Regions:
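Short, surface-exposed coil-to-beta transition loops
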Residues: 2-4, 59-63, 85-90
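Hydrophobic ligand-binding cavity/cleft-lining segments
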Residues: 1-40, 44, 137, 148-149
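Short, cysteine-centered beta-strand-loop-beta hairpins and adjacent loop/turn segments enriched
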Residues: 54-60, 110-114
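Short beta-strand segments that buttress and anchor functional surface loops
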Residues: 48-54, 76-82
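Short amphipathic alpha-helical signal-transduction/dimerization elements
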Residues: 24, 127, 131-135, 139-146
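A short, structured loop/turn motif at beta-sheet edges
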Residues: 10-14, 41-43, 67-72, 92-103, ...
Length: 149
């Protein structure tokens, strides 16, 4: 399954990329963010970050490994999380006039059995909601923060 959604921001792509890929900013926009585990890196292919999020009332660790890190253009990574199918993610940063379009993509193979029903019906909907929440939080951050000097 592939879930994809995009949103345009009125800040330069360089500013958006720098903010979004800086792990210190993740608590400001990542839905359910609890903490980033020590030793996590997120700036080059091969880096791995372990993020703890609150999902359905429980803390869960999400392990993410960067596959491609192209400044101001693209970040791709894989993720594993207990109880969910492994996933492939794309974060696209597309210049658009004075701003940029941030396009989020998640691909996963639904599991077999009852887990597959969840993956096909509820997980895709949850991913879309997380995308929308991320977009709204970033909109607030970019609207309220002065540009870096």
């Amino acid at each position: 399954m592939r879930v994809e959604l995009a949103h345009r921001y009125d800040v330069p792509v360089e500013r958006g990329f720098a903010f979004i890929t800086n792990t210190a900013n993740w608590p400001k926009f990542w839905p359910g963010f609890v903490r980033l585990e020590p030793g996590s890196d997120w700036a080059a292919a091969g880096d791995t970050a372990r993020l703890v999020t609150r999902l359905l009332g429980r803390d869960r660790e999400l392990a993410m490994t960067v596959k491609a890190f192209e400044p101001n253009r693209l970040v791709t990574y894989t993720s594993t999380q207990p109880g969910l199918p492994d996933a492939y993610h794309e974060r696209h940063f597309e210049p658009d006039g004075d701003g940029f379009v941030y396009r989020l993509v998640v691909e996963y193979e639904p599991r077999s059995g009852i887990g597959g029903v969840f993956d096909r019906m509820l997980l895709a909907r949850g991913i879309r909601r997380a995308f929308e929440s991320t977009f709204a939080a970033l909109e607030r951050e970019f609207a309220g923060a002065p540009p870096p000097s």
